[in-house]
């Protein structure tokens, strides 16, 4: 037993602890974001997976979905930036606002993927998602079938976080936060 071996063990344990803590915080953020935008952890997990495969970070996707949720609600009331964009895409804001988020995104993606000039897609994405819209052009261009395929792949790979698992991780993270606050 040498000092080098002991030090390597300590460094490894600290690294593993930090990795676990980061994983817990990421799951906690997923659950809190899902709750904030009125969706499930399962739906948000699938949407994040599809976004990641098309080059969009989870942070960007989360902000885009928050803005899309708000703008869709405004459009359903007859106001806001998204009103004209949704109409141009042939989507009914009042119907969209009553759908689960993943269904809203599937309907939007299907309408968005229809042949239109790239500049028009970009302009529509900005109206629907604000500045995060540019990042989502490739995700939306997949269409309903492409997104559904990615959702199924996420389930197959086990990257979809259940509500029960997310709730348990949130409790663990809250307990760790309290512990480290003392």
Regions found by a protein language model. Name each.
Residues 1-7, 23, 32, 116-182:
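Amphipathic/coiled-coil alpha-helical interface segments used
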Residues 1-25, 103:
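Short, glycine/alanine-rich hydrophobic alpha-helices that insert into or span membranes
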Residues 25-37:
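Alpha-helical transmembrane signal-anchor/signal-peptide segments
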Residues 38-44:
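Membrane-cytosol interface motif
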Residues 47:
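Conserved binding/catalytic microenvironments
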Residues 56, 73-77, 134-138:
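Secretory-pathway/luminal and periplasmic proteins that interact with or process carbohydrate-rich
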Residues 63, 67-106, 110, 114:
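Solvent-exposed, membrane-proximal periplasmic/extracellular interface segments of envelope transport
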